[in-house]
Amino acid sequence: MEKNFKRTTVTSALPYANGPVHIGHLAGVYVPADIYVRYLRLKKEDVLFIGGSDEHGVPITIRAKKEGITPQDVVDRYHFLIKKSFEEFGISFDVYSRTSSKTHHELASDFFKKLYEKGEFIEKTSEQYYDEEAHQFLADRYITGECPHCHSEGAYGDQCEKCGTSLSPTDLINPKSAISGSKPVMKETKHWYLPLDKHETWLRQWILEEHKEWRPNVYGQCKSWLDMGLQPRAVSRDLDWGIPVPVEGAEGKVLYVWFDAPIGYISNTKELLPDSWETWWKDPETRLVHFIGKDNIVFHCIVFPAMLKAEGSYILPDNVPSNEFLNLEGDKISTSRNWAVWLHEYLEDFPGKQDVLRYVLTANAPETKDNDFTWKDFQARNNNELVAVYGNFVNRAMVLTQKYFEGKVPAAGELTDYDKETLKEFSDVKAEVEKLLNVFKFRDAQKEAMNLARIGNKYLADTEPWKLAKTDMERVGTILNISLQLVANLAIAFEPFLPFSSERLRQMLNMDSFDWAELGRNDLLPAGHQLNKPELLFEKIEDATIEAQVQKLLDTKKANEEANYKAKPIRANIEFDDFMKLDIRVGTVLECQKVPKADKLLQFKIDDGLETRTIVSGIAQHYKPEELVGKQVCFIANLAPRKLKGIVSEGMILSAENNDGSLAVVMPGREVKPGSEVK
């Protein structure tokens, strides 16, 4: 039986303060969390939305070393950028703090000490990689090498970004230190571990029996971890950036970031509510909901609950809605490759269009499987749905009211059967949207809300009030009254999804406030109520705007390919006599034209110093014919003739293939006589 809670604590995964926020973060965590929180607030429920920056861990220290600054400089830069971006985008945190705060350091230290004093940790000595030149133990991200699975270079000690496989530092082939580049050695070090195996029995019961309603991807991943058998997990590591382990003999060691970061939810709450924070974390009448990405499932469903249970006074999460990953134009989003749409850049490039991105990310939400974001789909959903469906209906209803009734809501006369059917339809939508939001199906809930606008467009198209204006103004008034009630319902239904647009629509409708309980009513706007001047809610996004964004990504892709370029391996040696069999000459291009019905082929007439010969070459996608006329090219003169598209080709023009697949014809550095040999 579902329990009724007095309040809800909602957390969203703490973004890592070593870079900006991108659309993958938004789609996976922050947009769905914000939709849910706004929905609860609209229902007048007691809810707290907790956010903050995760500011400890190896990637931050690596970036600091690369830039020659301190880790604090790094986290200061990105914390404030992330916070500002969230505020501008409308992610409505009640508090957004950081794990480098004094409150967090104190609370995380006290949390560790309580578990330590209760005997909840085990101490173990193990061998870990050590950089003898830098005099430092190497955490996973400080070690790089060849991935044992896909054999790409540059894999980290915890993950290969190329193939996505989770790794241990000792898995790497030819490991090297990311600090000095030297080969690390193994050295003994002592650490504290949380024995997750000790918690396995109750975790299995709690997750697999008591939370079968969790999303299949969450439930399935938890079951997989439990079926493999839980192992002790280190809660400390050898680093100089982080929260010092608060026990004797732990000099040079800090709390592992996975242990420290989730405590940030609690410390951020304490920072906001120093006198009442425990109500939100320890009262059984409080519901705890974590919004995360799939890479955080094990930490929020197994590790953090084990920590809370071991401490003894905290509530456990009631639900952990986790999304899969969002890809970008068919490729995995990668911060290291700059393959992302960054939130702060989007806000600059698309001012006032926060809701467009919120809408598209929700429509494509990776709720049960990885999904893809493309700029063409972004444009299509804006133009064909927000503009053509939602915006079009609102504008028609408002403009017609302005035209026929001076912007005042007309009274409704006698209702037809069709009027009553329409009113019932949008009354039914409330129950469906509510049901979907309650089970975290945000994509379907938004789709259902958009159906309100579709109902409205159909109603106006079917009733055609503009045709009745000369003969039956009472009927026109009834049609527009129903249409305006539907517009008001749209403003309420879309508030969790499109808060900026709903606020603008509220002002146009001249409504004081919204209340979810009123959704579905057909008397939200009384007769005679004065509306404000209508404005367009959304505007079309032109092709040129989208092409600029696509080009930005293409430029990024090209830069990545150039940065990662490696020449192909040299082929097996050949004998000198074999090479001497090739007769490579320089010829002058007399004529050049495209080969009909062949996209890749150009036909050349070449002066080879003795005669004119024909050569067909597959470079039509890289050169225009007129670019090559008069140029000198290198070609193999003694290659056996071969027919291509019915044309006899008497040689092969030499080209160099670039890393991006483009071809560059080999030409002499200065003009020489046609027929000159290449030696």
UniProtKB/Swiss-Prot annotation:
Record-linked InterPro entries: aa-tRNA-synth_I_CS (IPR001412), Anticodon_Met (IPR041872), Met-tRNA-synth_bsu_C (IPR004495), Met-tRNA_ligase_1 (IPR023458), Met-tRNA_synth (IPR014758), Methionyl/Leucyl_tRNA_Synth (IPR015413), MetRS_core (IPR033911), MetRS_Zn (IPR029038)
CDD domains linked: Anticodon_Ia_Met, MetRS_core, tRNA_bind_EcMetRS_like
Localization, UniProt: Cytoplasm
Entry superkingdom: Bacteria
Chief place of localization: cytoplasm
UniProt cofactor(s): Zn(2+)
Signal sequence extent: none
Motif residue range(s): 'KMSKS' region: 332-336
Positions contributing to Zn(2+) binding: C147, C150, C160, C163
Domain tRNA-binding: 578-679
Cross-referenced Pfam families: Anticodon_3, tRNA-synt_1g, tRNA_bind
Catalytic activity: tRNA(Met) + L-methionine + ATP = L-methionyl-tRNA(Met) + AMP + diphosphate
A Gene Ontology biological process term: methionyl-tRNA aminoacylation
Binding site for ATP: T335
Annotated family: Belongs to the class-I aminoacyl-tRNA synthetase family. MetG type 1 subfamily.
Role this protein plays: Is required not only for elongation of protein synthesis but also for the initiation of all mRNA translation through initiator tRNA(fMet) aminoacylation.
Listed PANTHER family: METHIONINE--TRNA LIGASE, METHIONINE--TRNA LIGASE, CYTOPLASMIC
Entry protein name: Methionine--tRNA ligase
Classification lineage: Bacteria, Pseudomonadati, Bacteroidota, Bacteroidia, Bacteroidales
Gene transcribed to yield this protein: metG
